[in-house]
């Protein structure tokens, strides 16, 4: 959340918060953390942020230049560093479900890496377009309209509550916060705000939690730490396809995008990308939960079948309701293309007559594509298209081969394709690439593999093997990259 200063020195003219990183839990609780560590629970009208009183002055991450945020791994765990006099104050932010009946919350842990004590103000204010009509302090909690908005892990040293006639930042930074908890503040226009000011010794840390519902427990004792949450997300990706390419940034984006898709609003195209990247169970759950148009849901179901050929996904109470999907679409053209693909599924279910009807309805109609609609699906689709593009008779591997990738190793494991699960690797012998591949085909039909980004003359219909390709025409790998011999192995 960025703010402008007006000429009188009062610093607040609210502007809409930038889109940030979603964090959340399995029960549907979601919040957005922006690049300055401001947390907004989705569906609420308020945000929670923090300010730091250093030796020289107060610092607000939303307006300071020296703020750096990183996402160390695939998990939605963020580290935001604010430079203050003498060192950094570091905020680590994640979402977790508390022990017992605590429920879900966003947890923020602030670590004081400076050699001196600081004070931290944990502030609650209305978001742009939102309202806070009543705010009150209750010990370690701030309540918005009677519901817990934030809880700190220790007794505050000071409190500040304001209405529209006062500025919360001005009160806190000007020393106006008071020792005793003030009476609750009401504001008809929804501009009430408040802060808890907490001392933070040097080399120490504190936690606060932004809960989904009322919370009275101590955040430091109630929620798992960030490392445990990150390990949980890593376990969720154990079945996902993996890629290792010379572009390390792009390699890291794939698992992050898979996590982000599981926290995003369920969509049909999101379900397809989860399936393409090996997360079948999550794909089925996403497609079952989406409210996208019926035709898109049917098309997505057809793509899921093409990518995995798993009849169990369409059976039982936890499976996709095939009959409902088939009956619902108003767009008969899109439906026909999807039905043609699902005919094989109907055969597998022993519904030969329905399968024949589906093939007849789909005569001459191809399965529609579902274009990406957001950053995670765009990233995953772009990368999968580069790594394995469906051709008229098989798969084209490495359709794009940037010069920066030449000479670097490439590994792909467990990517789902319409022809089977695919894995391959590229190793280099000087300026010549060696390709190792394995395609676990869905059926016995031949699948032609090509590598147009490396050797346009190469093709094979063998399901597995290795081959030394020709040197890329007119392109020389960097001499600094050591050649490595092809090494066999499994890709799944």
Regions found by a protein language model. Give the residues of each.
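Helix-rich, typically C-terminal accessory recognition domains appended to large enzymatic cores
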Residues: 341-345, 350-364, 380-398
